[in-house]
């Protein structure tokens, strides 16, 4: 059987997430609760159209695959997840990407804190430090 051309394949998005829970959670328990929350919020038809799959999960971080047209619905269903095996838990979506590699590099491999605002040291030295020294 021939393979589908890339233009005919279903497009996917990858959601990097962090699971915050009281106790450690296994991958199978997480998958079960993700599918349950999606089907209870969206209904069986829309949940199947979302094509949600938990691709990777280690410790408290992982990647979920979904259809590119159903990212908002997938994020909403993940937000409704509040308990896993009767213990309190929540899912924090770190970001969305078009490839697994980019999702991993950008959202899951945080090695150092970088502020969002870049500060020019010369500007800081001239304005703010002189005011502090005068006080």
Swiss-Prot record:
Its EC number is 3.1.26.5. It comes from Methanosarcina barkeri (strain Fusaro / DSM 804). Pfam families: RNase_P_Rpp14 (PF01900). The keyword Zinc does not apply. This is Ribonuclease P protein component 2. One of its GO terms (molecular function) is ribonuclease P activity. Its main location: cytoplasm. PANTHER family: RIBONUCLEASE P PROTEIN SUBUNIT P14, RIBONUCLEASE P_MRP PROTEIN SUBUNIT POP5. One of its GO terms (biological process) is tRNA 5'-leader removal. It comes from the Archaea. SUPFAM superfamilies: Rnp2-like (SSF160350). Belongs to the eukaryotic/archaeal RNase P protein component 2 family. InterPro entries: Pop5/Rpp14/Rnp2-like, Rnp2-like_sf, Rnp2_archaea. Consists of a catalytic RNA component and at least 4-5 protein subunits. HAMAP family: RNase_P_2.
